[in-house]
Amino acid sequence: MSKIIAWDIETCPLDTNTFTSRQDRRHSLLVNAELDKNPSTSYEDASRKACSLHPMLGFICCISVAVEDEASLMRAEVHSFVADDPETERQLLIDFRDFVGQFRGMDTWVTFNGKRFDLDWLLHRCLHHGVQAPGNVRMMNRNPYQNQYHADLACVLKSPAGLADLCDHLGIESPKQAMDGSGVAQAVAEGRLDDVAKYCEADVLATLECYLIVKRFAAAAFA
């Protein structure tokens, strides 16, 4: 029986003291752009945001995966992989790759903005650590116009809105409650990896629920 596999990542900034000269230049450009756009933002917040959004300036601290049988009425199984620094990130990537490697059939992969963000981070961080990236061609499909095998809801609906907005639109409880993306770096710094995993898991379950609703009422959008 085929599976529906929703997944999501959380990211953290690298220590700017470890940056190469090229990373420093990239960091300065991105921070200055953020400060120009939001003058009331502190330098620290602008730096944290810039690093958490660029895979050469940050690392993946959590990947969560929700797996559900297409015909099942049972709640999806959820698995999380966490890292508290760039060194442990390498094992996170290996564990995630090995876990998703078991799915090689006619499965459907589901993300929200995964083709532009999550997959880009996954590839960059695997390359940085010399880790073989997942080999599933369905999961790794980044074509924004092909959503049959990798259903990126941000590409399917093409609306300038986030996951929380889509949840609100569909009447689904928002995963952005006890924490949102801006709080992930602080939680990791404080050693609260369980909180980060719970937040990431809430994201993948919400993404899965959104997908099931959209697929039910607009199945042709995934053709």
Give short role names for the model-derived ranges:
Residues 2, 58-86, 104-223:
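Metal-dependent phosphoesterase core characteristic of DEDDh/y 3'-5' exonuclease domains
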Residues 2-124:
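Conserved non-catalytic scaffold segment of RNase H-like nuclease domains
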